[in-house]
Every structure is written in C-alpha cells, then in structure tokens.
Amino acid sequence: MAKKSDTLKVKVLELLALVGELSSDEIKSFVNSSSYGEKIITALKKETLIRKYKIEDRDLFRLAPRGKKYLKEILPGEFESYLTRQRSMNRIRDDKRRIERRDKLAKMLFMFYRADIKILPDEKTLLKSSSVNARTDGTDTTDAHRPEFYTSMEIKNLVPDYKTSIGSRALGILIANNMLYIVYYTADGELLWKHNSEENFLKSTSRVLARKLFGKDYGTYQLVFGDSEKTVAAIMKRYDNGAKGKIYPSADMPNMIFALANTVKDATLDIALHCPGFINDLKAKYGGDIVYDEKMPFFDGVKKTKYRAENGIIREREEFYLFAFLFDMVKVAQAVDVAVKRKYEVRIYCFDYQQKYLEAFIGKDAGCNITIETVVLERSGEDDGE
C-alpha cells in the first residue's frame, strides 16, 4: 500500500480524485518523467488503488474503490465531496463535452502545478479553514501572495450561497497577488463566450465571493488560457456591449504588446515572476536561452475611473492594463523592452532572490518607468527550488 510519505503517488491519487480520470501520458506529464510515471502507474495498479478502462480508443485510469477509501483514510474530510457518485467527475464519460472539459481541467492543473500554484485540496488554505462562511473580516484567509487554484466545485462547497452563472465556461478561480481570477481554458479550440453569462459571473464573483472569502472586496478579473498562436488566449470582452474582444497569441508576449500599442497609448504591464527551480537553471544557462514548457497566461482589460474635468464636468478615464505570469527570463526581457519603447509603465513582482537576475537580464538603464517589487512567499525549498 502506498504510504503518505510516497508524495508523488499520493499526489497522483489526489489529482485523479480532482479530475476524475487521466491517461498514462497525462500521469507521466504530471510527475514530469516518463519512466518514473510508468513505475507509479504500475505500483498503483498492483496495489489496486487505480483501475484502467477504455473509452473512445483511449486508455484511461480512474480511482478504484480501494483508492477512494485510501484517500479518505490518509486525508480525512478533504475528499468527501470529490468522491461522491453525484459529482460529474466521478461518472464515466460517454459525453464528448464532458471529456473535453476534463481534458481542459487536467491540462490547466498540470500547468499550474509546474508553476507552483497550489492545486491539490490538502495544500489549499481555504479548504483547511472551517470559518469561511462566518468570516466578516480579513482574518484567517489564504496568503495574499500565495497562488492557489480552486475548482468550481470547491468554490460551491466553500460558499453554499454563491451561485455561478449557468452559461459560464469558467473552470475555477485563481487567487494570487490580492486578486481573484476567473479562469478559462480554450485548449486548441475556440472558446464559446456568452457575454451576459460571463458578465454576471464576474459581478457575482466580485461582490459575493470576495467578501465571503476575504471579508472585503478584491479585484476580480477574467483569465483565459490557450495552447497555440492559432487559438484564443485573450479576454473575450472589451467592457462594451457587443464587442468580441481581441485575440493574441498565448506564447508571444512581445507581439501581443505591439498589437495593443496600435489601439492604446498608455498602459500598465504587470509581470509576476514565479517558478521553482528557477535559480539552478539560471546558474546553468546564464546568458543563454532559458526555456520552460509552461504556457504564458495573461489578461487585459480597461479600468474606468471618474474624474472632474477643467470645466467641472465629471468624465471617465480609461486605463489599459496587462497582467502576465512569465517563467522565461528571455521573454521577460523582450516584453519589458517592447513595453518601455511604447512608454508603458512596467511593474515586475518577484522573489527577493530573483531581483539581481532580473536586473542583469533587463539592464539597469532600461528605463525609469520600470519598477521591480519583491514579495515574500512561503517556499517549500531553498533558493534552488528543491
């Protein structure tokens, strides 16, 4: 029987509880090793913790009854809502839409996991708290800077009176940097964006969810992921009725900024730099290309603020903003270079130990409109990312 100390084995079981089913390739991708992933699959099958079945010519793995019982024993109370037969993720899929949604959720969770965003139930602060619904102030909340992703099911269990929009395509909520991000994922297809449904979901999240979870209003935004330059990876609304939004390549931040510069004169680019194991890669490849597999999520939008004009009339000012999680120093430098040339304000958030490397890559004379702010995050290892 796998032990709680068998970290990766347990994490695979947790992920299966969260998503419902995974292919062998997905499990190998999750543990970031083909050979070790195969060993984990073999061990879990031998211990009858998982079982295999075939659907649409795909071999998929699900939790076996013994695996569900085992999770409940080692993590009591944390997986009850995931393992009920009423939950759609625990029903074998014969519906193409359910299969696609499961695939999207799995891919997104892998990306978050590699970016050290907490995705598993026993790692999330709010799921360990029993005072969410009674909270009236900002105490006993998740770390304001520690990124955590909550699925739609987890949010519903946390806040029973929180209603999501029926037509929304959102997969969950990402909490990071004092913000709530409604997360969407297009995979390699297009996202069917229902403007009214997503607008209602945004308002509900901002007004109800933020107050319930934090005891106060927090900034709430929409975050869309895509797999390639040919797919949608942008916010599908522009804060005016009927607009379809703009489409930018998900893997090319500099080009995205160039495209934005055609329509926006002044903007703010916020970059959050966060990747475990980052220092070792820099030491090994300093000065060369640093490549990561993670896709580059970002969002854009317009913040409207009212001001009094010289003639005394109240008017609205539109401020354009960008936000990005970047894991590649070369892309950071490229994005900053383009933004500076376009006279954008740039704010970079990073660990204290990353600041000197940022300055080395970007150059101290890159521009006076660049601000590097360090944040304090609890890390599982030392600077080498262990």
Label every PLM stretch briefly.
Residues 70-75, 192-197, 334:
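A short, polar/proline- and glycine-enriched secondary-structure boundary/capping micro-motif
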Residues 57, 178, 311-312:
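Intrinsic-disorder/low-complexity loop/linker signature
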Residues 41-44, 50, 61, 173, ...:
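Hydrophobic beta-strand residues in large extracellular and virion-surface proteins
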Residues 1-86:
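Basic, Lys/Arg-rich alpha-helical nucleic-acid-recognition elements, primarily the DNA-binding modules
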Residues 183, 190, 208, 213, ...:
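Long, compositionally biased intrinsically disordered regions
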Residues 89-200:
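Exposed, interaction-prone assembly regions rather than primary DNA-binding/catalytic cores
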